[in-house]
Amino acid sequence: MDYYDVLGVSKTASPEEIKKSYRKLAVKYHPDKNPGDAEAEKRFKEVSEAYEVLSDPQKRESYDRYGKNGPFAGAGGFGGMGGMGNMEDALRTFMGAFGGEFGGGGSFFEGLFGGLGEAFGMRGDPAGARQGASKKVHITLTFEEAARGVEKELLVSGYKTCETCLGSGAASEQGIKCCDRCKGSGQIVQSRGFFSMASTCPECGGEGRVITDPCSNCRGQGRIKDKRNVHVQIPAGVDSGMRLKMEGYGDAGQNGAPSGDLYVFIDVEAHPVFERRGDDLILELPIGFVDAALGMKKEIPTLLKEGMCRLTVPEGIQSGTILKVKNQGFPNVHGRGRGDLLVRVSVETPQNLSEEQKELLRKFATTEKAENFPKKRGFLDKIKGFFSDFAV
């Protein structure tokens, strides 16, 4: 692997050209833009390894003179044992290449990756500033609540900002000092061959500061445990598996960082009569064979406030036929109208007949005509045709 080829630059490229090419390729292959893509992850590590060497004048001179396995390359060459296999190292190189653009609350990554850079710890927050953890709760709704929308009150446990120290963790301003070991950065940088390795400062735990006079209420944590009631407005049309995001209702952040979020996961109970399919409702309607033959008008249940609607069943309807009632289904959760009520007709054959009923049916059978049963007649015609062909 030639580092110049990896970055797509010539051997006489200036530091600015090398940096420009690296930044373009690193953004292209960054894992946040290519989730689950092993080839992109490999390329991201390769361009980071190449930039780590070519961006340093001393390493570049040694590489130009001796190649990857030069006398200053370390035990496994410039890339260590088998190259830059650690994604953390590659990401650190990436952050270093963009310099001050990580400031302003991570705005660079929010613009580049839609905020996904936070998953790799790329927020531009001060040392020790940690966003509060997000919380998740599950809520079960009745079928009717999901259809009409409802407000629920939830009891949520977590952490809130200490009101005594306002989240600083110290009893007074004088009770906080800059960490002497890391000089406020929260990290200790060590050189390993040609690479620089950063690790969390053991003195301050990565916060960049040391509390000498802790707050008595939160014991220096800046947060205290808390339980609170949260009102959640559930929109009409939700379904099982959906979730609602309530920004800022999670645990309080530390050292000025924002609070986490609250995720409400929805589960909807089954209904004894209706079945849901998207925004449509399915109702199984059993009817007798007389009603199926003669037709009828039937009051059927709905989820609307009226509770019932009148359905016309045409004469001669067959079992399995679906009748549509417009705009009597579930409301769309995004406010785009309602679904339909789909009534699936099931013609029930009578059972446990008395002798009188059986006799009436036998008399009826003597009056049957072929046009009364078009499917039956069509089937018999097919059978006749089949045996005629077979005989030939």
From Swiss-Prot:
Cofactor: Zn(2+)
Biological processes annotated in GO: chaperone cofactor-dependent protein refolding; DNA replication; protein refolding; response to heat
Any one Pfam family match given in the protein's UniProt record, by short name: DnaJ
SMART domains registered for this protein in UniProt: DnaJ
GO molecular function: ATP binding; heat shock protein binding; unfolded protein binding; zinc ion binding
Organism: Chlamydia caviae (strain ATCC VR-813 / DSM 19441 / 03DC25 / GPIC)
UniProt-listed InterPro entries: DnaJ, DnaJ_C, DnaJ_domain, DnaJ_domain_CS, HSP40/DnaJ_pept-bd, HSP_DnaJ_Cys-rich_dom, HSP_DnaJ_Cys-rich_dom_sf, J_dom_sf
Ranges where the J domain occurs: 2-67
UniProt subcellular location: Cytoplasm
Cofactor note as given: Binds 2 Zn(2+) ions per monomer.
Keywords: Chaperone, Cytoplasm, DNA replication, Metal-binding, Repeat, Stress response, Zinc, Zinc-finger
Protein name, entry field: Chaperone protein DnaJ
Domain notes: The J domain is necessary and sufficient to stimulate DnaK ATPase activity. Zinc center 1 plays an important role in the autonomous, DnaK-independent chaperone activity of DnaJ. Zinc center 2 is essential for interaction with DnaK and for DnaJ activity.
